[in-house]
């Protein structure tokens, strides 16, 4: 919501705007930004001299961002309540949008009112394309065999995979391995590929803004730990070069704002879900998929974090 309002104001500076999540008393702006839950609360509680402020005819237009999600069952009251035209926006491929989402907008399933494909946006100069750098590691591809590990890794293996009855599996196949935190050597290899092949700024002296998509919080913290061991010289003056940004943080939005600033650290954000969708940082040059993504819709949302234009960056 914060980013949406910020970008809207930059395009229409003379339009009065309000973010109801942060500005509790500014209800008279011409353009209102809100989460679904905040708006539902305001409909019930906000009043003026004539009674309820947000009547069914209060708005001339209602825009629903991230309309690919299963929003109707949870927030159908909002869509049924306001009688203004409803516009839904999503970056999800049209064949991945759920049927009930099309029904909200009175559309035939799989046929949006208007579609603008990534390839066309790149051709028209509104977005940039992506280039893949595939990195395969032995453990992820083949699994782990206990007898092939070093003594140090055997100790980690025993702590991680020992059964309740004390027995130890001889090997963990690649499919099962993806349910556990990746080992330190694998993380080192992935980080090495990033630091070697990732796009750079400052005349090639510094890795560009990067999002690493981690499997879970423990995995993210492990990646950060290994990064700091491998590249301690990059964090200077108390400013971390890499940082975990997820819902375990107390001030997540502040961390996102710092990452979004080209002149501030961190340069690398290690994220668990929080930066997968909905964040707009044009300076992001590198995306590291350090987890399996089973949803095609989510995958393209994640790809979108790195397709923004940023003239003069490199």
Regions found by a protein language model. Give the residues of each.
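Conserved Walker A/P-loop ATP-binding site and its immediately adjacent core
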Residues: 1-10, 214-220
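Conserved C-terminal RecA-like helicase domain
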Residues: 17, 24, 30, 168-271
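SF2 helicase catalytic motif II
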Residues: 37-39, 50-88, 93
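Conserved nucleotide-binding/hydrolysis micro-motifs of P-loop NTPases
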Residues: 37-40, 68-69, 84, 92-96, ...
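Conserved RecA-like P-loop NTPase helicase motor core
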Residues: 37-38, 61, 235, 242-314
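Interdomain helical connector at the RecA1-RecA2 junction of SF1/SF2 helicase-like NTPases
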Residues: 99-207
């Amino acid at each position: 919501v914060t980013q949406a309002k910020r970008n809207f104001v930059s395009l229409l500076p003379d339009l009065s705007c309000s973010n109801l999540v942060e500005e509790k008393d500014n209800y008279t702006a011409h353009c209102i930004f809100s989460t679904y839950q905040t708006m539902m609360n305001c409909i019930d509680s906000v009043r003026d001299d004539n009674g309820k402020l947000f009547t069914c005819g209060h708005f001339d237009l209602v825009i629903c961002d991230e309309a690919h999600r299963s929003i109707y069952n949870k927030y159908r009251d909002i869509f049924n309540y306001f009688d203004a035209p409803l516009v839904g926006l999503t970056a999800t491929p049209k064949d991945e949008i759920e049927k009930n989402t099309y029904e909200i907008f009175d559309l035939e399933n799989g046929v949006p009112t208007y579609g603008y494909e990534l390839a066309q946006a790149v051709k028209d100069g509104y977005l940039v394309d992506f280039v893949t750098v595939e990195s395969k590691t032995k453990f992820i591809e083949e699994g782990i065999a206990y007898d092939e590990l070093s003594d140090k890794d055997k100790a980690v293996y025993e702590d991680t995979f020992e059964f309740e009855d004390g027995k130890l599996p001889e090997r963990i196949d690649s499919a099962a391995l993806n349910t556990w935190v990746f080992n330190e050597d694998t993380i080192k290899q992935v980080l090495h590929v990033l630091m070697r092949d990732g796009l750079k700024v400052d005349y090639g002296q510094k890795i560009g803004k990067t999002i690493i998509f981690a499997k879970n919080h423990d995995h993210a913290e492990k990646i950060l730990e290994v990064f700091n061991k491998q590249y301690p010289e990059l964090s200077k003056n108390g400013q971390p070069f890499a940082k975990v940004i997820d819902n375990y943080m107390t001030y997540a939005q502040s961390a996102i704002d710092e990452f979004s600033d080209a002149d501030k650290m961190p340069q690398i954000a290690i994220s668990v879900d929080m930066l997968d969708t909905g964040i707009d940082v044009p300076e992001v040059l590198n995306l590291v998929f350090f987890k399996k993504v089973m949803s095609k819709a989510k995958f393209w949302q994640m790809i979108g974090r790195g397709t923004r234009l940023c003239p003069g960056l490199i």
